[in-house]
């Protein structure tokens, strides 16, 4: 059930192993082993930016709309990569990440705050 996946995913502490695939895409270690899942056989042509996904034993976050084959489990309103920002990537290798389940109202509020 999706509620169990969410509960297990937000219970873990993650560490950014590296950034790659696309600028700002974090490969996160610390996934509950029961949530590990293979990549899709047929990758999607468009994965929305902010999508939280699982690929094998790792979690990742798509920083922008990109093609991708990881299994999508959620999304974040946070912008992970902004060319004009200093530094341009919100996360770096070694950073710790903790996910939190939020409702649609809080999602929209955080999304709007990032545009200011």
List the predicted regions and their residue ranges.
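Glycine-rich active-site loops that engage anionic ligands at enzyme catalytic sites
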Residues: 1-116
């Amino acid at each position: 059930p999706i509620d169990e996946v969410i509960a297990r995913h937000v219970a873990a502490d993650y560490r950014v192993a590296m950034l790659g695939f696309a600028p700002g895409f974090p490969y996160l270690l610390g996934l509950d082993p029961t949530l590990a899942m293979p990549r899709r056989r047929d990758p999607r042509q468009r994965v929305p930016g902010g999508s939280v996904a699982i690929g094998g034993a790792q979690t990742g976050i798509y920083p922008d709309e990109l093609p991708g084959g990881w299994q999508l489990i959620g999304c974040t309103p946070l912008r992970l990569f902004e060319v004009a920002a200093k530094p341009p990537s919100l996360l770096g290798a070694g950073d710790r990440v903790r996910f939190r389940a939020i409702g649609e109202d809080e999602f929209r509020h955080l999304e709007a705050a990032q545009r200011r």
